[in-house]
Design a protein with these regions (language model features):
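A short, well-structured juxtamembrane/interface segment
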Residues: 1-21
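Glycine-rich phosphate/diphosphate-binding loops and the adjacent beta-loop-alpha structural elements
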Residues: 17, 23-31
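Glycine-rich phosphate-binding loops that contact phosphosugars or nucleotide phosphates
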Residues: 30-160
Length: 161
């Protein structure tokens, strides 16, 4: 997990700036990643530890339409917001998220796996958190762990330990 420490830190910093400046974190995924996007949004809204203010976070998904999260992001996200896109599948979610970012709306954080089709090289724009490639069930577990770490880092940045 050392290989994802810096991208997680960069993603937490970007989300912190977004929230401090009055933005919203939009969490999106398709297929199995929908549940993890909901988890991330709920964790930011509700917290998992001591009482704290809710953070503006929204999960975008539609089980019947894999294009829905990206349509919703285009309609709702504004400059200063952040889109956290998850893809443990074939790269189609990455393509949708990159399309939203190309439209000039939110900052973009991609959480996927090494070798995912369409995953851009690691860098600052977008921020890429590339998990080690693994069987799908293990990859979803790694995504959940990475999201837990990301949300914790955001909370520490905003509220201290």
């Amino acid at each position: 997990m050392d290989t994802i420490a810096r991208p997680l830190e960069a993603a937490a910093e970007a989300a912190t700036h977004c929230l401090v400046d009055g933005g919203t974190v939009f969490c999106a995924g398709t297929g199995s990643d929908r549940a993890l996007a909901r988890y991330a949004a709920d964790r930011l809204m509700l917290g998992a530890g001591p009482e704290r203010p809710a953070l503006p976070a929204v999960a975008l998904s539609d089980p019947g339409d894999p294009a829905a999260p990206w349509r919703e992001a285009r309609a709702l996200a504004r400059p200063g917001d952040l889109l956290l896109a998850l893809d443990s599948g074939d790269g189609s979610a990455l393509a949708g998220a990159l399309g939203v970012a190309a439209a000039g709306n939110p900052a973009l954080v991609l959480l996927s796996y090494e070798g995912c089709p369409g995953l851009p090289p690691a860098g600052d724009d977008p921020i890429v958190i590339a998990l080690p490639a693994a069987p799908r069930d293990q990859l979803l577990t790694l995504e959940a762990m990475a999201l837990g770490c990301l949300c914790h880092l955001i909370e520490v940045n905003l509220f201290g330990s």
